């Protein structure tokens, strides 16, 4: 009798292991298809961005082109991170924003801001570096938003919090999205790794802009709102990294710093161009 029970347990254990392996293989195939789909979108979006911005007539840029390029960088980073972490919970949010941003240049075509810059390899490198930094920080900001929602979700489940829009969201359909995200500690680690990489590129972009502004404006340095906001954002991100490494700043406070720093970075160019192009109708 004991032998029969033991054999049944062994069979059940092997069946369970086989089912788990089958689920794992199915999940990996599903992830590969998602990665392939994202790669195709990246190629199409990237070609469109390059053709829209680097034209034979000159460098065409505006807030719509900036958002579209920022979304492309964000999706690229998501695609790279997707090989190492399961970030499917971020996919609907990131793809939704990327689709919206990719069509903005059709409505807001921008304007030629320089006929010389398009022929300068050095300025192209500065331009690409700056926009990659924008996209990386955008990715970090989205992670900060989702981390805030994750944290609020954990608290809301304990006390059934419906006193705020965030509490209502995470108790509703948004909780399904959050369940697909990695644990908070992994999300936080990825976020700070991303910010570290973005800060290095932002440093190069901010200080190389001093030299390449000569191409656009004929002066090595222009002190205007864009310069001030860019330097302020750079200092805020640097302060955030310093506080994280030295005093262990993390969690909700770190997420607030990320969102605040990125908001200032947006004001440096995209915000000002939006006001000029959409509100004031000036190119």
What are these model-predicted stretches?
Residues 160-215:
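A mid-sequence, solvent-exposed acidic-amphipathic segment
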Residues 267-283:
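Juxtamembrane boundary at the C-terminal end of a transmembrane helix
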Residues 35-51, 104-106:
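A generic, lipid-embedded transmembrane alpha helix
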Residues 243-263:
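Interfacial loop-to-transmembrane junctions
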Residues 62, 213-237:
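Short alpha-helical packing/oligomerization segments
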Residues 1, 70-78, 131-147, 232-241:
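Hydrophobic cores of alpha-helical transmembrane segments in multi-pass inner/ER membrane proteins
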Residues 55-136:
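Membrane-interface helix-loop-helix junctions at boundaries between adjacent transmembrane segments
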Residues 1-19:
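N-terminal signal-anchor/start-transfer transmembrane helix
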């Amino acid at each position: 009798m004991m032998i029969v029970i033991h054999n049944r347990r062994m069979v059940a254990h092997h069946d369970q292991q086989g089912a788990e392996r089958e689920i794992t293989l199915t999940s990996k195939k599903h992830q590969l298809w998602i990665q392939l789909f994202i790669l195709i979108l990246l190629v199409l979006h990237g070609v469109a961005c390059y053709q829209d911005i680097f034209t034979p007539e000159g460098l065409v840029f505006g807030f719509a082109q900036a958002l579209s390029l920022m979304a492309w960088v964000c999706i690229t980073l998501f695609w790279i991170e997707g090989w190492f972490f399961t970030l499917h919970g971020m996919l609907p949010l990131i793809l939704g924003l990327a689709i919206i941003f990719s069509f903005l240049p059709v409505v807001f075509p921008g304007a030629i801001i320089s006929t010389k810059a398009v022929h300068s390899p050095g300025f192209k490198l500065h331009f690409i570096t700056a926009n990659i930094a924008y996209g990386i920080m955008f990715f970090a900001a989205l992670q900060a938003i989702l981390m805030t929602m994750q944290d609020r979700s954990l608290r809301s489940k304990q006390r059934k919090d419906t006193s705020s829009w965030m509490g209502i969201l995470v108790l509703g359909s948004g909780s399904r999205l959050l369940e697909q995200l990695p644990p908070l500690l992994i999300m936080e680690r990825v976020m700070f790794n991303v910010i570290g990489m973005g800060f290095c590129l932002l440093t190069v972009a901010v200080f190389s802009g001093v030299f390449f502004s000569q191409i656009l404006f004929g002066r090595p340095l222009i002190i205007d709102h864009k310069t001030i906001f860019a330097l302020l954002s750079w200092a805020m991100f640097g302060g955030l990294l310093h506080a994280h490494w030295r005093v262990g700043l993390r969690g909700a406070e770190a997420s607030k710093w990320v969102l605040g720093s990125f908001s200032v970075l947006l004001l440096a160019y995209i915000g000002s161009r939006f006001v000029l192009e959409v509100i004031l109708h000036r190119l």
